[in-house]
Amino acid sequence: MTVAEKLAELGIELPQVPAPAGAYVPALVDGDHVYTSGQLPFVSGELVNPGVLDDSVTVEEGYDAAKLCAINALAAIKSVVGDLERVKQVVKVVGFVASAPGFDQQPRVINGASELLGEVFGERGQHARSAVGVSALPLGTSVEVEVTVRI
């Protein structure tokens, strides 16, 4: 099954990549790797589940936000490589989670991104990962995810 077929089976339609809000690009090809900028959980221009984990956002809502970040990362990758079939391996995922003091469930939140990538790419979706708690993220988002792939 192709990546496009798998996305369709999962009911996922990749969004248009929004124009950057600053002096950066959404994704960059360097040799045989693609690096995404931090992706936020936007759907149709609206930030989903903003706030802080263990305060105004639940682990489940954070998980869903991380999944949306991964979908947006796939859209950014596709925008620079043309076809997600070119992805040979998801190499690394870095997830940032806006966290209340004492919150330690960042890995469960970032599983939303990791599990989606595994579903979409199968074995090629296995990756190294960091899940980091921070006090605040841009625009008040609860989660931000970066993805690196090899093409």
Regions inferred by a protein language model and the residue ranges of each:
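Short, polar/acidic, helix-capping and beta-turn segments at strand->helix junctions
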Residues: 1-151
